[in-house]
Every structure is written in structure tokens, then in C-alpha cells.
């Protein structure tokens, strides 16, 4: 039991979220670099002479230099076992991103120092805030011209509604960026070396040391730094309970590309962020330190290894210890099973694991029995973890196979990719699945879907973008749904569960359609438990 407590206590499982190009994937790579998981940090943008970033594993990601699927990476650092959930940073992300946040115990929010809080940051922050998990802020790209640090703190508080506490303070920005002041240790960290591919050296020196003015090449800069730090000291105090409740975000400044502030951030973050949190199930709260194993499926990914045509279900372990070949119980399937090939991943690279603990993420071979949100327990326990949210799609496309002889592959491909949660599939009532309406949260998923159907299933698609922006469930209608009076701004659809829905070209069209059809009642599907 003491080993179980020790192993779980050293786990840290967190997601990294950001707006596109804020430097999230670069920061992830530097964490892996410091943890010894990789010897050289990859450069994200596609350059022929520089390898692709470790977390960007799908072929389309390597070509575009963006992350479009959520990767899972584990490494060891200073006695901690770290599980990073790397979410897509592209503007058009998917439900996969939201679901990945359900598996995290905390989040690192990466903000571009020049741009501040951007639209996608707000979306992802909202999902984290919904779960009340601790959120840590890393203000990146301080080696470029950036906003005033005080303005950035104000912006985070104003835009996101969370209080902030600066853990360190930048020394200059842009060409003048020379390091950070660590408030907890009350010392300056000067960094030498600008190569993003090597670990940065650091020089520690007291803030009031006369040498600081010489190192900064200016007494004025030294005085400004002292004034800033003293002003911070007169402000809000650090409150760990507020951090744990997701009400206060510790803020760190640095530069992922040039390594400024990365290692101090990682060390402080690991001390502040919590070990695996308790999770809510239908029988109550499950303690992560319980000896009984339990987990839930938060992601399904097909064809991670094209040669094997495999499908992996990613499970977040919530309590106890997992042991390879032990007998477990699939609650939704109501049957016992052995998970004989459990794998831990570094993006697309995998290795078989014999044991894993609460906080860890493992991938298990899925012949098609798992669904997102499923619970796995030890035999004799039949509780279910709270469902994983599904989010209403915002973009729609009519899709069919160009070659009608590829019908079987088309149906299989669309169903498998939909089961992963990247797309949602609808059809016109009474029709088959030879032609479907695909709904997504972000339009990049259309490109990914088209690419994967061709690359993995050998099916070229005919795709017609539809003008719809809103979707509603039909709750009530006194007549036959096929007799609905619909104009060109609405269409009747059916989902895989057989539920009837309407899609609309605008928010205004919803009210107009309801008025044209007395007795019609519809409702939003903003967040539904999956």
C-alpha cells in the first residue's frame, strides 16, 4: 500500500492549452528535453532539415506544422512521473481537444506575450474552468517585443475572470530580454546561450546586488526592476487553496524557443500542481489512492500504426494500480476482460507496460467494444464515471464517396473516425449511410477527415459545404416530422442514435421555423454527457 501511495503521489497529469502559434508545442518539447525524454527539441514549422516535433505524429501534422490530434506523452523528471496531454493548438480544433481536458488534473495555459489572451485561449479556458481544475499561465515569447507585464496580468484577469499571481518577473523583453526574477527564491536568473536545442545555463544573483546594474548595462533598468518587484509585493498574496480551486492562476514569464525560464517554471509548477484528483462517479467520489483500479476512456484513435490497422482506446487511470493481464470489468459492456497489450505513448511511439497507476494514461487495443466515456473497473465494482461532454457541431458538410464501389470502406471509415470523436455523423431520415452530413466543432477537421479517408481507407470524397451554423434537438412536434414546413434555411436530420434534429443557417432561422410549425419545440445540445 505504501508503494501505491508513493507512486500515485508523484504523478502529475496536465494538459497544455493555447491559441495557435503561442508556442505550446515548443514548450512541450522543452519539457521533454529537460526530462531527458528526447535529446533534441524539434522545430515545429515544416523545414526539410529539421525534424518534426515529437508530439505532432500524424502525417498531416508533420506537413502543416500544426497539432491536430491530442498526443499523450510520459516522462520522468526530478522524481515526478509526468503525463502531458498535448492538445491541438490550431484555430480549428475538435471535440477531441475538449475531451482531453477531461483527463487532466491541471492545465498550463500558454499565452503569446505580444498578443495576450486570444479567442481559442478563451474557449479552452472555459472548459477548464467548468471543471474547476488548477490553471497555470506561461507567458511565452518574452524574447520578442511583448506587452507590458502588468498589462498582461490585467488582461488575463479581465478576459478570463481568474485572479493572477506572478511567480517570476521578466527582465526586459524583445532584444533586451535577459532572464527572470524568481519571487519565491528572491533571486535573479540570468541566462546565457540562445540555442533552443540545448539546456540553458543560469546565473543566480540577489536582486539588490550592485552587480545587477552592470549585468543589465543600466542602473535605470535595475531601478525599474526593483520598483516592479516591490509593486508586486504590495499586491495579492499567493493562495494555494485558490490555485487548487481554479480561482487563482500562478503566472510565469519566459521563452520556450530560447529556454528562458523553462526549467524554473517546470520545477515550480510540479511542486504546485496537484497529484491525481478524486473523480465523481454515480456511486459518489472515487479516491485516487484506493487500491481498486478504475479508469475511463477519453479518446479513441484508429490507425496510429497504418501497417497494423489498429485502434487504440486511451484510458485515464483514476484510482489504484493497473497490472497487465489482470482481469478487469467493462461496465458499459457488462463483461470481464483482460487487457494484455497495454501501451504507454510518446506521440506515435509506444511501449508495452506491465503496470501503471492513477494519473497515468494507457492505450489499449480496441476491437470496437469501447466508446468514449466508458468505465473500466475491477470485477465486482459496477460504478460509472460521469460522462464525457459532447459539444454541438458548428460547421456542416454533405459527404459521399466519389467511387460508389467504395461504399463499404466509406461507411467503415466515417463510423470509425466518428467514434474517435473528431466528427459527428448525421443522415437524412429514410436514407442509408452512402451519403452523410458531417458536423464538426472546427473546420480543420474536414481537411483531416478527407485526408484520413483517402490515406487510411482508400476513399476519395465528394464534399459539399452546407450553410448551417446551428443544430437543435427536436423535443416535440404534434405531426409527422416529414411534413415540417422547412425553408432553404433549415434541414431535418437524424443522428446515429435515431434522434431527430434540425440544422439552421442562422440563429434567427430557429425562431422563424418554430413559428412556421406550431407545436414544434427544440432544444440546444450545448454540452451533453456522452
Where are these regions (language model features)?
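Structural and coupling elements of P-loop NTPases
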Residues: 1-530
